[in-house]
Regions:
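Phosphate-binding site of ATP-dependent enzymes
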Residues: 76-163
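Protein kinase-like catalytic core scaffold
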Residues: 65, 100, 122-123, 168, ...
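Conserved N-proximal alpha/beta basic substrate-recognition cap immediately N-terminal to
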Residues: 1-47
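Conserved anion/nucleotide-ligand pocket segment
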Residues: 62-84
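Short, hinge-like loop/turn segments at secondary-structure boundaries
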Residues: 33-38, 61, 84-85, 118-119, ...
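C-terminal active-site "lid" helix and adjoining low-complexity regulatory extension at the edge
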Residues: 161, 165, 174-207
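Conserved protein-kinase catalytic-loop segment immediately C-terminal to the catalytic Asp
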Residues: 66, 173-174
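Rossmann-like NAD(P)H-binding beta-loop-alpha module
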Residues: 42-65
Length: 207
């Protein structure tokens, strides 16, 4: 997840998986949203002093909303903020790190991860939680196989057309029942994929 190291290797003619461009973009949520703002819908995000808006309604920042580290993974440093006190605590927990503020989706505790190899959809997995607004498998979320509809497939295809992916996960949350882009997981973990399928992701990746 070090794009500088990736760039150095690429300059020496070494093929890097994922490319340094993917590593730079996918490992900073603010940069990801800016890069994809004209590609897929997502809930409005404030990054730095700018509000990044995509083609979706409800662009305000009334409570509740989410504060999350730009570089966090696995659901770490993601906070649901319901009032000014919780906002203060969340910002303090960032300890000076870059973060984004995002309008909260309506369908909490539910998201989909789409596994990508070589720009192709391998499998989609639905994650749910009744205990937390975060549905990460590592945090106790339940998983099951998920079938993407045509609109969701089209969003994935637009993303990989804009940002080719060797191996990654694309995550979507749900707002009023519709999938909206959440983030790209560079060098994505595959534990939950093994729970819902017999796919050997390592073998596919090597091929």
């Amino acid at each position: 997840r070090n794009h500088i190291m990736g760039e150095l290797l690429e300059q020496k003619g070494v093929r890097v998986f994922n490319s340094s461009s993917v590593t730079r973009i996918a490992n900073n949520k603010g940069i990801t949203y800016e890069f994809l703002k004209d590609v897929v819908p997502f809930l409005a995000v404030k990054y730095g002093n700018e509000i990044i808006e995509s083609k979706i309604e409800n662009k305000g920042f009334e409570y509740p909303y989410v504060i999350k580290s730009c570089s966090g993974h696995g659901g770490s440093q993601v906070f649901l903020v319901n009032n000014s006190k919780e906002e203060e605590q969340a910002v303090k927990a960032m300890n000076g790190q870059e973060y984004v503020v995002q309008q909260c989706c309506s369908d909490l505790g539910r998201d989909v991860r789409v596994y990508i190899i070589g720009n192709k959809i391998i499998k989609a997995v639905l994650r749910t939680s009744t205990e937390s607004f975060k549905s990460n498998y590592s945090l106790g979320g339940k998983v099951q196989e998920y079938t993407l509809n045509n609109e969701e497939k089209a969003m994935v295809e637009r993303i990989v057309d804009k940002l080719p992916l060797d191996y990654a996960g694309i995550d979507f949350t749900f707002n009023n029942g519709k999938a909206v882009f959440n983030e790209i997981e560079d060098a994505v973990g595959a534990r939950m994929l093994y729970q819902v399928s017999d796919i050997d992701i390592v073998e596919m990746y090597i091929k």
